[in-house]
Regions:
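Phosphate/anion-contacting hairpin/loop surfaces
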Residues: 65-155
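Extended, highly charged segments
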Residues: 1-63, 84
């Protein structure tokens, strides 16, 4: 199972090829997400961040893609127009003019309006990501002093 550092490295690789780029095509395996393919196509990727083992892809269209690799999920990055030889099941594809970011075998993918992403059940339970370069002691302090987390242990 991929752990936090592996997800952080995947986010860094994805950021390198996706951030600042417009999506020329979007694919979701899940029927529930198919309607978002047209909505997200043409959106520019603003940021890719991790929250624990979740990866959040923020778009300028006001949506954020939440993905969690679970046990077997794996990201592959290939040049545009290419597809890796694999027996894994493609769950999501984010295409730009130069690259494709392909998520295989993951079972937890959602698209939410960015303003409510923190309401996602997984994200609502966890604190800030310690691997986030933008994390400050003020954010940690605010979280620890919040009603929801007051009097809870850190470890």
């Amino acid at each position: 199972m991929p752990e936090g550092p592996e997800i952080r490295r995947a986010a860094d690789r994805l950021s390198h090829v996706l951030c600042g780029q417009s999506l020329t095509d979007v694919y979701f395996f899940s029927e529930e997400l198919k309607a978002f393919e047209k909505i997200l196509k043409g959106s520019r990727v603003e940021a890719i961040v991790t929250r624990g083992k979740a990866l959040l892809t923020s778009l300028d269209s006001g949506y954020t893609i939440y993905s969690h690799n679970q046990l077997y999920g794996r990201w592959n990055i290939v040049k545009a127009g290419h597809f890796p030889k694999t027996k894994r099941s493609l769950r999501m594809a984010l295409d730009t003019h130069s690259h494709r970011a392909l998520l295989f075998s993951a079972s937890d993918i959602n698209v939410l309006q960015s303003e409510v992403i923190e309401d996602h059940p997984f994200l609502a339970k966890i604190g800030p990501d310690i691997l986030d370069e933008g994390l400050t002691w003020k954010v940690v302090s605010r979280r620890l002093l919040s009603d929801k987390f007051r009097n809870r242990q850190l470890a």
